[in-house]
């Protein structure tokens, strides 16, 4: 007989963020499984541009958990964190002798889930 604990998970999603999903995953791997407050401190002091976007989404997920599910922010941890590839913006860079080189500007969708300890 197995005992299952009913765990509420609340999530927040940031869509069409103009950053490479590869660079976003580098930061998400650092906060996955950490406590909410600890993850905020890590994001505050990491030198990457993506940290501000992830911090905003994490705060939104915590606010959703507190408001919608009645969970305590001090008891939350990052249960789920992943970045999916979004649509790529395609642009052209003019080059010498009438040529044009394609430029691909990637976007991503960031999903963060928080649960209570």
From Swiss-Prot:
UniProt xrefs under InterPro entries: Ribosomal_uL22, Ribosomal_uL22_bac/chlpt-type, Ribosomal_uL22_bac/org-type, Ribosomal_uL22_CS, Ribosomal_uL22_sf
Stored Pfam families: Ribosomal_L22
CDD domains assigned to the protein according to its UniProt record, in alphabetical order: Ribosomal_L22
Keywords (A to Z) from UniProt: Chloroplast, Plastid, Ribonucleoprotein, Ribosomal protein, RNA-binding, rRNA-binding
Gene Ontology molecular function, alphabetical: rRNA binding; structural constituent of ribosome
Protein's cellular compartments: Plastid, Chloroplast
GO cellular component, one term: cytosolic large ribosomal subunit
Family: Belongs to the universal ribosomal protein uL22 family.
Function of the molecule: This protein binds specifically to 23S rRNA. The globular domain of the protein is located near the polypeptide exit tunnel on the outside of the subunit, while an extended beta-hairpin is found that lines the wall of the exit tunnel in the center of the 70S ribosome.
Subunit composition and interactions: Part of the 50S ribosomal subunit.
Stored HAMAP family: Ribosomal_uL22_B
Name of the protein in question: Large ribosomal subunit protein uL22c
Organism expressing this protein natively: Pyropia yezoensis
Gene, per the UniProt record: rpl22
């Amino acid at each position: 007989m197995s005992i299952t604990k009913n765990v509420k998970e609340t999530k927040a999603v940031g869509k069409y963020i103009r950053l490479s999903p590869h660079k976003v995953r580098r930061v998400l791997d650092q906060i996955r499984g950490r406590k909410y407050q600890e993850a905020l401190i890590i994001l505050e002091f990491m030198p990457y541009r993506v940290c501000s976007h992830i911090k905003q989404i994490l705060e939104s997920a915590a606010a959703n958990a507190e408001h919608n599910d009645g969970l305590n922010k001090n008891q939350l941890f990052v249960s789920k964190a992943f970045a999916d590839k979004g649509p790529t913006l395609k642009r052209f860079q003019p080059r010498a002798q009438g040529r044009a080189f394609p430029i691909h500007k990637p976007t991503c969708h960031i999903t963060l889930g928080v649960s209570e300890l």
